[in-house]
Amino acid sequence: MQLEKMITEGSNAASAEIDRVSTLEMCRIINDEDKTVPLAVERVLPDIAAAIDVIHAQVSGGGRLIYLGAGTSGRLGILDASECPPTYGVKPGLVVGLIAGGEYAIQHAVEGAEDSREGGVNDLKNIGLTAQDVVVGIAASGRTPYVIAGLEYARQLGCRTVGISCNPGSAVSTTAEFAITPVVGAEVVTGSSRMKAGTAQKLVLNMLSTGLMIKSGKVFGNLMVDVVATNEKLHVRQVNIVKNATGCSAEQAEAALVACERNCKTAIVMVLKNLDAAEAKKRLDQHGGFIRQVLDKE
């Protein structure tokens, strides 16, 4: 697909004279365009749901969720991956973000990195990619060689693959087994796909990782019950989570958390089932860490 024919490279009539308007009007134009992004994502919800189910199946079988992208797309994958351990208590490495050009590229542009097909393949080889893993290729244009080659290599290994792009019929969408293509139209600044396309990608990644964690028992109701308390704010959040899940007092919640080494799931089961920490943990282990199953089946 030629660059000039891509929707993400088109000219946006709504912003054609954005350099001549007031600062407030400038903001209104950008905001009006941003409002269209969730609607574009809404149109591909069935595709997102299908991807979540596949990701969950693979991760449940011992696989990993691997994000692969260049530039803004790569950074968004790294952002999503890096938030999973503290938010959901998963081990670092379960969700992995890879970016063309390596760690240096997180903060700096690395010339030519996105054009390296070898880079996409080698980065996946370096993390020991296996057929159990799911590779999610992220590229607003859908034409990034680094991502396309990575998806091709992943499919050769037998991996399940997902392609996120914002141009219908792109190489990324046709190379991946599952295509997620929110079409957000032309950008406010022509070709600046870090804007609407980047926002759409972030919304999709939010759903993929959050959906995986919900289906993995990391959420009870709407509470992040595997949150790791790495700072004072999260210590307080843990107390509130146990309170909200059980209806107990803050003092009871804190006491339960202290007794079980600050594991929210265990504390919740302790309070709701009137158990000590060891027995609560045992029952959770018997039900794969799902609070709901402990409560419903016992």
Curated annotation (Swiss-Prot):
Catalytic residues in the record: E83, E114
Q: What is its EC number?
A: 4.2.1.126
Q: Which PROSITE patterns match?
A: GCKR, SIS
Fetch the Gene3D superfamilies from UniProt. 1.10.8.1080, Glucose-6-phosphate isomerase like protein, domain 1
Does the keyword field hold Lyase? yes
This protein's source sits in the domain of life called Bacteria
Pathway of action: Amino-sugar metabolism; 1,6-anhydro-N-acetylmuramate degradation; Amino-sugar metabolism; N-acetylmuramate degradation; Cell wall biogenesis; peptidoglycan recycling
For this UniProt entry, the molecular function terms from Gene Ontology, in alphabetical order, are: carbohydrate derivative binding; carbon-oxygen lyase activity; ether hydrolase activity
**EC primary class:** lyase
Catalytic activities: N-acetyl-D-muramate 6-phosphate + H2O = N-acetyl-D-glucosamine 6-phosphate + (R)-lactate
Keywords assigned? Carbohydrate metabolism, Lyase
Instruction: Provide an example Pfam family for this protein.
Output: GKRP-like_C
Q: Which GO terms describe its biological process?
A: 1,6-anhydro-N-acetyl-beta-muramic acid catabolic process; amino sugar catabolic process; N-acetylmuramic acid catabolic process; peptidoglycan turnover
Q: Where is the SIS domain?
A: 55-218
| InterPro entries in the record | Etherase_MurQ (IPR005488), Glucokinase_regulatory_CS (IPR005486), MURQ/GCKR (IPR040190), SIS_dom (IPR001347), SIS_dom_sf (IPR046348)
| Reported induction | Induced by MurNAc 6-phosphate that releases the repressor MurR from the DNA. Repressed by MurR in the absence of MurNAc 6-phosphate.
Q: How does it assemble?
A: Homodimer.
Q: What else is known?
A: A lyase-type mechanism (elimination/hydration) is suggested for the cleavage of the lactyl ether bond of MurNAc 6-phosphate, with the formation of an alpha,beta-unsaturated aldehyde intermediate with (E)-stereochemistry, followed by the syn addition of water to give product.
Family affiliation = Belongs to the GCKR-like family. MurNAc-6-P etherase subfamily.
Q: What does the record give as the function of this protein?
A: Specifically catalyzes the cleavage of the D-lactyl ether substituent of MurNAc 6-phosphate, producing GlcNAc 6-phosphate and D-lactate. Together with AnmK, is also required for the utilization of anhydro-N-acetylmuramic acid (anhMurNAc) either imported from the medium or derived from its own cell wall murein, and thus plays a role in cell wall recycling.
> Which named protein is this?
N-acetylmuramic acid 6-phosphate etherase
The organism encoding this protein is Escherichia coli O17:K52:H18 (strain UMN026 / ExPEC)
Q: Which gene encodes it?
A: murQ
